[in-house]
Amino acid sequence: MTIVHTRVILKTQRNIVVHICAHKIGKESQLNQRIKDLKENIQNLNDAGVRKTYLYQYVAESLNETEGEPTQIRRAKAFAHVLKTVEQQVLPYEKLAGTMLGMCQLYENVMSKEEQHDYATKVIEEYLAKKKQDQDFDGSIQFGEDHAKSFEDDFTSKKSRWSLMSRVHHDASIEFKDLQQVISDMEEKYKDADIEDYEIGRELERAFKIPYDEEMKKTYNDLPWFLGNHINLNYGKMIAKGFDKLIAEVKEYLSKAEDPEKKEYYEAALIVAQAGSDFIKRYAETLRNYKEQAEISETRKQEIEVMAAICEKTVTKPADTFYEAIQFTWMLHIIASMQGGSALSFARIDQYLYPYYEKDVKEGRIDAAEAQELLSCLWLKVNEPKMRTVQSVTLGGITRDGKDASNELTRICLQTAADVGMPYPNIGLRVNKANPDWLYTQAVETAKAGCGQPQLLNDDVWIANMKKLGYSQEDANDYYNMGCVEIMVPGKQPNWGVCEAIAFPVLIENVMKEWKKNPEKIQTFDDFMKLYYAEVDEAVEADYQDVVKKKATMKDQCYDPYCSLLIDGCLENGKDMLQGGSECPMHWSVYAYGIGTVADSLCAVKKFIFDEKKITMEEMYDALQKNFEGYEEMQAMLLKETPSYGNGIDEVDDIANDVLSHFNEAVMDLNKKAKTDKFVSTLFGYFFHIYHGEIAGATPDGRMKGEAFSDSMGPSQGRDEQGPTRLLNSVLHLNDDLVTGGYALNFKINPSFLNEEKGEKAIEQLLKAYIENGGPQVQIYTTNMEDLKDAQIHPEKHRDLIVRVGGYCEFFVNLDKVLQTEIINRTLYGEA
């Protein structure tokens, strides 16, 4: 039996010390037979093969019929045509009707393995010929003055690759696993050619595409087809209203509208409202037709009839029961997904569904197990093909009026995630100093199950920072995590706007190039940092100017009538959310990542060039330009002796804090000149740290050209050697007062860390101490090194292995090998 020792000391307001040791994981997942069968069926659907979307075809059909009509009306009619035309399907075992499968059916023209190999060879040969012809063509970023383009130029010109995991393998003509195999084959075949591995991956992922051609061009060029994604669509309001009442409201607004622009908006709103209502009514008919025609049991026929009756009712009347509320929520969600929606969020589902659950329990209609079965169905629906786009759920926190919001449905949702064992939805658990103890206990139980959920979000940090953006106390109290980690107000904001991501480490390159041109500019480390901050300011300003251009393009061209129908403010203002109609402003996220790499690199510059004078600027510049070839001893010293972020070392943590503080202030300052929207700083890298790292040169911390940068707010891979407490202390050292967009800190734990009750309590205390001392966010996941390494060799044995990538989870076998290796290289706590 393992003895568990726990010691928790709060050293300072923002410092914690926790010693933990424990062994072996907890109880087995509890699924009833229906959910087991439903899960297996959905996994089989995901593994069935390549899927072709019919969105472009349906939209193009409508656009051909509406030439000459106003853009907003054409957009609404195209969406209505999609809902009217798409095939509706009924799946085995499900208790929630509605699926995207009719929109994305299996693609028939998949190449054979031999054809894939031959086509890939042709693609690479043509690429190499082009490279040989064009003497100025450069297939990789060079670290030095001869490099004419900035990092941002290279990224925006699509120098990097993208398909690092299966769910972003959009519009592909071969399966992701086949793409990985053919890439591997070509890397081996051309290992001696003038081509980098990432170039091979990039060219092949672009080449193996389904030829949508004119349909896709028409969809995106005629309107353009812009839509709300990374958004919550006010499901709580809608399930209490129903479509009939909403349609009546739209008609009332339309009858009173005198302004032509408002009248056009209401006409578009009426088209999509009626289309949504008709889609759900048609699903009731589809279910009943299936019931009559399919060879199914009487019990199954009764279940199908219940779904049909709920669909029929909730179109015309508000939901009365938990089952009705969750079914209508899913229908609203699937309708938005039909137009290509991505990262749609259920937001605070334990708040708006809880009254229905509470009422049903009191009246004897449902118990916790039955509620969990329905939630399990919802969790699994989110994991169906083409639905797996980081759709989020937010739990816990406080109510709009500041009271504890955790309830029995919060617990059931967390237990559902643990039992179902799927990557989505992405759960954000809001926590604060007033939370009941059971909330942390349930969070650790869920994480222990290996599902990668939940992430913890600190109410005290995010509510305060939302108020700094100008939000009311009530709206700030109501925040949710959209998609991965991004912070928004539910039901009141248009979609999340994305700026060009800023790689903190790459900006060092520009400073070094400036020194090469003008050595007199850098005499001290302060001089170096002044130039570095100037690069940060320039990158932030470039993002602002890019948004100005995007906004000019969006004006009077970009509309999403369906999402605008459901977002607060649009009906009242008579204006689409993308044209400024929403109650709350759009957030434009200035992403930045690689804090570990940049902090370590700047610390190396300070220590070895300016403090100890062991390296000259010329030597460092030359070493980086040559990727440490001929400078192996220098690289070894940098790797061994540079203080690394993530170990609780003030020397390097101070630098990390200075960089982040400057960046956050620069982003916040953009709001002084932004007229309507808000600019927010988001310390999160999705998987940018991989594909940006692949095309970037060496860095002063000893990292070589092409290697990954550090992940989001995490340390450089494997360099946090002093345990989880020191890592969290480094994070607590950073000033997060102006972090307004989002934050991702990954925390990988061996499952043996979470055995026995004492081990669980130790982790609870660690997380609670971190939150109470001001930690903004943390996401833990359990895995062991043996499983990760074996899954690279025998993926078929590890189909259900889930890992945290950035601010989201994914099956490990659905990641490309470079991303898999980066996750393996992260420190695994509790292994020894």
Where are these regions (language model features)?
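Extended, non-transmembrane alpha-helical coiled-coils
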Residues: 278, 282-285, 289, 306
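A conserved hydrophobic secondary-structure block that centers on an alpha-helix together
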Residues: 293-295
